[in-house]
Amino acid sequence: MAKKGFGGGMMPGGGNMNNLLKQAQKMQENMQKAQQELESKEVEASVGGGAVTVKVNGKKEVIDITIKPEVVDPDDIEMLQDLVLSAVNQALRNIDDIQASQMSKVTGGMNIPGLF
């Protein structure tokens, strides 16, 4: 009597493996779509009462920095550097938060390492 090889018949549960594969493919498509949408987003962060504003896109590229002329003090460059650094870091945190929220919606709250 010949033995059936692995997978030589219906999976227990009536083909749940096919459904699982379809769900995984759909999730992958949704993640790619969400990633494309995220890359087109732009986020701003302002510090120092609006003295410095930084805009980043979903690719985490700084696309604009606005500095009010009144904060440019040649005798205190360090303060301006701190404001720019703070604004850049805040803008990056903002885009990270948006990305995490968007991916959580796509993955149904599953934490999948390395998505972004």
Swiss-Prot record:
Chief location of this protein within or outside the cell: cytoplasm
Localization in the cell: Cytoplasm, Nucleoid
InterPro entries reported in the protein's UniProt record: YbaB-like_sf (IPR036894), YbaB/EbfC (IPR004401)
Keywords: Cytoplasm, DNA-binding
Pfam families per the UniProt record, alphabetical: YbaB_DNA_bd
Molecular function in Gene Ontology: DNA binding
One GO CC term, this protein: cytosol
Quaternary structure and partners: Homodimer.
Function in brief: Binds to DNA and alters its conformation. May be involved in regulation of gene expression, nucleoid organization and DNA protection.
Entry's family note: Belongs to the YbaB/EbfC family.
HAMAP family: DNA_YbaB_EbfC
Name recorded for this polypeptide: Nucleoid-associated protein CD630_00170
